[in-house]
Amino acid sequence: MVTSDETVLATTTNKTSITTEPMEPKSSDESTDSETDKIKILKAEQREALTEATGSVEVNGNEENGHVECATVDEVAHVEEDKVEEATNSVVDLSSNGSSATTSVPVEEQEEKANEDETNDVVMETSENGENGKEENGTAMEVAENPAVTENGSKSDGETETDRVAIKDSQEDDSEPVNGSVKPEEKEEKNDTDAPMEEEDQNGKGVKRPVECIQLDDDDDDIQEVSPPVPAKKQKTEETKQEPKQEAKAEPADDNEQAQIRLLDKLQEYVGDQRGQPCNKTRKVLDTLLGAINAQVQKEPLSVRKLILDKVLVLPNTISFPPSQVCDLLIEHDPEMPLAKVINRMFGEERPKLSDSEKRERQQMKQHNPVSHMTKLLVDIGQDLVQETTYCDIVHAKNLPEIPKNIETYKQVAAQLKPVWETLKRKNEPYKLKMSRCGVCGFQTESKLAMAAHKETLHFTGSKFQCTLCKETDTNEQRMKEHYFEAHLIIAKSEEKESKYPCAICEEDFNFKGVREQHYKQCKKDYIRIRNIMMPKQEDHLYLNRWLWERPPVDPSIIQQQQAAALQQAEQKKRHQQALLREQHAQAQAAQLLRKQQLQQQQQAQRLREQQAQAQYRQMAQLIQQQQQQQNRNNANNMSNSLIQAMQAQLRRSGTGTSPQNLNLLQKQMAAVLKNQNPAQIQALVASMNKQTQSPKTPTTPKVAKAAATPTLPLAMSASSSSPGVSFQCEICDQTVHEKDKYLSHLQVLHKQMVGKTLQDMTQGAPLACSRCRDRFWTYEGLERHLVMSHGLVTADLLLKAQKKEDGGRCKTCGKQYAFNMLQHLVADHQVKLCSAEIMYSCDVCAFKCSSYQTLEAHLSSTHPKSADKKKEELITLDD
């Protein structure tokens, strides 16, 4: 093998036998310069011979696919044999012709010393080269030598072995080895076995003695001095060796690159053909790539195999697409490999378990974001940027909210956070863009496109136009545009004028504000109309979704399940409704039965009360009759008879309408009359009982008659002949009272109202009227209660009573009686909205007004006294 470091001439042999003439040892004093000169001459001749042999082998060698075949060169072998013989003979001649004294040094030591003086350049090696001298990327040159070296160039008896001689050139260590050369360690193996014995003698007789094979270091300085290089020959040799080296290097690389280019071209062509063809492949991308590779394997199997072995081409069995706005994750995999196994290989068998907070955060992100994966990606990028900024401030101790108290602890924390900050800094590098700045106006942006568009706009500095790409200035706008086009090939745009009075909707500019306002009114109407027209409806959203997303395939099993679930839900709903109806019907029947029972109980209780009342009346009648019989003897016979007749008529005609209260009242009155025996009282009692007998039932409570409808009668007629069957409902407590005089006494006794009034005053009608509904009332408290319950108006007096916990009474809505907190009950329980009202009292005769009813009464009594021609009516005016 020929390299730039060494030149090897190899011949296969089993034994190495070199016959030389016997040499006599010489002393160191007898060594002359002639021996050194001869050795130099011999080495120069050997180099020339080896160079010529190498050149002939390289010229005549055949190259195929980057490999150089071995050649057997007979001429080189013969030349080398002659050179070796000449070198041996010259050494023998020098040793035999020297005029030195004989010493007792053995023959082996003399030979070793002679070899050292010869610069140790001849190395005898016996090795066999496997693979016929061929390596992976280089070749080895073999030369077979059959003749054995003898003393006069003849063969020794019985020896027909081949010799392998390796001659190393120590002067070529620094040159570059040829591509594919075998390592020097493999070429220069030590021969630890004993050297073959040589048969030599001074008289030509062979004597066997051991010959040592010496391996010398190429880096020995003494050898370099002894054997200087030949510049001319070495340069020529290197030129001849570097040419095949470059060819051997270039060819494999070119082959790989060409194979890759051809494969990529075929892949592109195949994928382009398959992309437009309809197919039923479930793994579109993976099957297309594998089909393209298989098609190329059939055409160039060796090149594709070499790419696979060099790990340039990898056959995929799984292709995964990252999450996007269209899909969460898409994986195409080999059907022989289950999906679970693919996921385990991609993400690992043990998936990280999320904490409760992370699960909650992920669920919230899915609820509030339609594309949660992309949102999570952007959120992570933002969090990393914020963390990097925070950690940078902590590590460099800047922008801190306060000075750290413990400096050592802070330094430890900063040292721990520094690698984390560096990692985040490297991770966030793609998201940090360099700010570009306009040199004319100072505009800054991270986008190069935005900066390019900005620089296309003319910049006016106040007195002249400045080019944004160079230092050109001009006062004329057209000339500056021509400069942009000629110098920079850019069509410049004029700078937009600043808006004076722009429209907020269409951004149209106006010179005057009034014109802008007129335009804005019409523009707003048009904008609202167009927005209502262009507003998408529910059908538009439906059509848009149908256009964006394909309709999923119909699965009969899923439809059947959905239909069965819908039927089951309908049946459950129907059964639930039927159960509700049955329950409601049962509740209605129970309520009806309860009402019947209550009605029966009430009827029975009423009959019982009537029977008791009749028994009491009989007893009273008997008592009265007995007493009257005793008293009739005196002066009251007629009166007692009339009383007895009235009582009997009352007992006979007493019906279901008589209440226990009236019976008790009659009993008390009769007892008092009998005790006092006052004729006037007995006459009045008889008249009242006659009236009650004439009215069998008490009618429902009508409203108080108006003053205009009530005729003005004298006191005697009104007292004796008041309209029968009329009942009054108290405007303060809602209690029903028969007869006007009883109602007056009810107001005076129970409610302490209308004190000092007589029945004649009530004949003129109720004095107080509501300005909202024109209803009339006898008392001020009744008017206040009506305003609150019916109209939600609160007077100042009622508000003062509420503050003092004196706003009691009966609620008209629910009928409950309250000692206080009536207003709070209306607001909380009945949701009545209350507002304040101021009541002004005005005189009907004159224009007098006041806020107090007592003041109005004093005014009427003093200014307008009672007379037959005047009526006393006060009208209330409400100022809300």
Swiss-Prot record:
Biased composition (Acidic residues): 108-120, 215-224
Residue spans of biased composition, Polar residues class: 1-20, 87-105
Zinc finger residue extent: C2H2-type: 436-459, 465-488, 728-751, 768-791, 809-830, 841-864
GO CC, any one term: nucleus
Region (Disordered): 1-37, 82-257, 350-370
Keyword field: Developmental protein, Differentiation, Gonadal differentiation, Metal-binding, Nucleus, Repeat, Repressor, RNA-binding, Sexual differentiation, Zinc, Zinc-finger
GO molecular function: DEAD/H-box RNA helicase binding; histone deacetylase binding; identical protein binding; RNA binding; zinc ion binding
GO biological process: gonadal mesoderm development; nematode larval development; oocyte development; positive regulation of gene expression; positive regulation of transcription by RNA polymerase II; vulval development
Segments forming CCHC-type zinc fingers: 501-523
Assembly and interaction partners: Interacts with hda-1, let-418, lin-1, mog-1, mog-4, mog-5, mog-6, pie-1 and unc-98.
Biological role stated in the UniProt entry: Has a broad role in development, specifically in the genetic pathway SynMuvB that negatively regulates specification of the vulval cell fate. Required for fem-3 3'-UTR-mediated repression in the regulation of the sperm/oocyte switch. Acts by regulating the translation of fem-3 mRNA, by binding to its 3'-UTR.
Name of the protein this chain belongs to: MOG interacting and ectopic P-granules protein 1
Species: Caenorhabditis briggsae
This protein's encoding gene: mep-1
